Amino acid sequence: MVDHVVLLALRADVTEAALARFAHLLAALPGRIDGIESVRCGPSTSPEGLEQGYGYGFLITFADEDARDRYLPHPEHEPVSALAQQLAERVLVFDIATER
């Protein structure tokens, strides 16, 4: 299993409508790309205050590394990636491979 963690430092002018559109794109991925087990997204709720400007994030859980590797060049990934780049000043990606 691979957890694909993506953190976004949002631009100051990002609207709730834009974030809702982004969440909708993400939510549709499991039905469109084989090997995606789940998608979760939202703003940070951590009380620690250690986000360093990364106030929004999403987590895509893949069945395995092959599924993650198929997702990256997949045509359904492109709109997600493009919108993330529009919404964010900075993007941080961190993948964690674990056994079930």
Identify the function of each model-found stretch.
Residues M1-G55, A63-P73, I96-R100:
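Short S/T/G/P-rich N-terminal loop/turn motif that feeds into the first structured element of a domain
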Residues A27-I33, E76-A82, A88:
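A common structural junction motif
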Residues T61-F62, L87:
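Conserved catalytic core of Hanks-type protein kinase domains
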Residues A84-R100:
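Charge-dense polyanion-binding interfaces
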